[in-house]
């Protein structure tokens, strides 16, 4: 699968502070879901 550069909000656990990281991941396959979030006011 082709890898894409994705900017993702990474957090160690629910409710924790998150940091934006550039991740190299593949496109979702089958029933996988890639969640995209847009951050505002940053």
Curated annotation (Swiss-Prot):
The cofactor note reads:
Binds 2 Zn(2+) ions per subunit.
Q: Does the keyword Cell division apply?
A: no
Query: Which reaction is this enzyme known to catalyze?
Result: an aromatic primary alcohol + NAD(+) = an aromatic aldehyde + NADH + H(+)
Which cofactor does the UniProt annotation name?
A: Zn(2+)
According to its UniProt record, the EC number is 1.1.1.90
Keywords assigned by UniProt, alphabetized: Aromatic hydrocarbons catabolism, Metal-binding, NAD, Oxidoreductase, Zinc
What biological processes does GO assign it?
catabolic process
| GO MF terms, alphabetically ordered | aryl-alcohol dehydrogenase (NAD+) activity; metal ion binding
Q: How does it assemble?
A: Homodimer.
Q: Could you tell me what this protein does?
A: Oxidizes primary alcohols with an aromatic or cyclohex-1-ene ring. It is highly specific for benzyl alcohol.
Please report which protein family the annotation says this sequence is part of: Belongs to the zinc-containing alcohol dehydrogenase family.
What is the recorded name of this protein? Aryl-alcohol dehydrogenase
Q: Which organism is it from?
A: Acinetobacter guillouiae (Acinetobacter genomosp. 11)
